[in-house]
A protein has these predicted regions:
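C-terminal motif of bacterial Sec signal peptides marking the signal peptidase cleavage site
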Residues: 15-18
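Beta-alpha junction/loop-to-helix N-cap segments that form part of ligand/metal-binding clefts
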Residues: 77-135, 229-244, 248
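Structural motif
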Residues: 72-94, 203-217
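An alpha-beta-alpha
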Residues: 42, 60, 145-192, 294-309
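Extracytoplasmic "Venus flytrap"
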Residues: 34-61, 67, 74-83, 177, ...
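Hydrophobic alpha-helical segments within soluble ligand-binding/sensing domains
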Residues: 128-167, 268-288
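Bacterial signal peptide processing site
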Residues: 20-23
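Flexible loop/turn connectors
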Residues: 256-308
């Protein structure tokens, strides 16, 4: 009888231990899931596929992973199709992202129009105000701030004239669909007038118009300037080849088009801009309000020359062109 009672007590003890272990297992599982909730999730939207925007994305992603190793990045590319931007923003909302990184003006505008609460960091936007992204650069209102790729047009023209002192007519192409580009054209006209230079402009609706457009202005220009325009950047190889055949030098505001054949750039570094955006994102993910993170403008610039294009134009021995330049083949 005593043995039976002891046996029952042992079974009861084992049962209680088992129940206790079962209760402990569930909280351990929930804790593991909750640890995942601490990892931040960022939605990245890139408006088109060209070197400058790729660099702005890579600079951001590399830097944000360096400072936030557990961050999850969901990257989407609209491939130049503005109609898919709303659905990309919706997909970020469905994924409950903590922050949106929008690369280029149309991506930033789409993000702002589609989302009013999730913090948005833009990049590769020349004039955030004329793009209607915000009004206060120092204390951004709403949920959006970011990095501007604006670089002084006057400084670029000074560099251009120092290399090509005899130029009179500057050719420029722009997308009629980008407010960013229209702003740059107006700035260029004002600055060029101060140097006694004339601007010959041509607008394009899409990349299919580029070949014809560049041919129409080549007889009228001494040099071509590639502004930071998504259509122009995407078609920079086409533009560069046409200009080389016409023996017309070309100038860009950033390095990407130079890798595609444009002669020279003196302007911003988009990898650096991406890193700056990542720093802003880290501040916001760390608890800062968007209004406490002012818009950033680049102060770092560099000169890059395409060696093959310089050779084709007979300029590879030009000291003014090659001085202090990074050379790409």
């Amino acid at each position: 009888m005593k043995f039976r009672r002891v046996f029952v007590l042992v079974l009861l003890s084992l049962f209680l231990v088992s129940c206790s272990a079962g209760k402990n297992e569930k909280p351990v599982e929930e804790t593991a899931k909750e640890s995942g909730e601490g990892a931040k999730r960022i939605g990245v939207i890139q408006i088109a596929d060209h070197i400058a925007l790729e660099r702005a994305r890579k600079g951001f992603e590399d830097e944000i992973k360096n400072t936030n190793p557990d961050v999850e990045i969901i990257s989407k590319n609209a491939n130049g199709d503005l109609t898919v931007v709303p659905s990309i923003i919706k997909s970020f909302q469905d994924k409950n992202v903590d922050l949106i990184y929008a690369i280029a003006t149309p991506a930033a505008q789409g993000a702002k129009n589609g989302e009013k609460e999730i913090p948005i960091i833009f990049n590769a936007v020349t004039d955030p105000e004329s793009a209607d992204l915000l009004e206060n650069l120092e204390e951004p209102e709403g949920n959006i701030t970011g990095v501007s790729d604006y670089f002084s047009i006057e400084a670029q023209l000074e560099e251009m004239i120092s290399i090509f002192p005899d130029i009179k007519n500057i050719g420029v192409m722009f997308s009629t669909n980008e407010a960013n580009s229209k702003f740059q054209i107006e700035e260029l006209k004002k600055a060029a007038a101060g140097f006694g230079l004339n601007v010959v402009e041509v607008g394009v609706n899409n990349i299919n118009d580029v070949s014809t457009a560049i041919k129409t202005i080549e007889p009228k220009i001494d040099i071509f300037m590639a502004i930071t325009d998504n259509t122009v950047s995407s078609a920079s190889t086409i533009i560069a080849e046409s200009l080389k055949e016409a023996k017309i030098p070309s100038f860009a505001s950033e390095e990407g088009p130079v890798e595609n054949g444009i002669l020279i750039s003196a302007g911003v570094d988009y990898v650096d801009l991406g890193k700056k955006a990542a720093g802003m994102a880290s501040e916001i993910l760390g608890g800062k309000k968007v209004s406490e993170v002012p818009v950033v403008f680049s102060t770092d610039t560099r000169k890059v020359v395409n060696k093959k294009t310089a050779d084709a134009l007979g300029l590879s021995e030009d000291d003014n062109l090659m001085k202090d330049a990074k050379v790409v083949e």
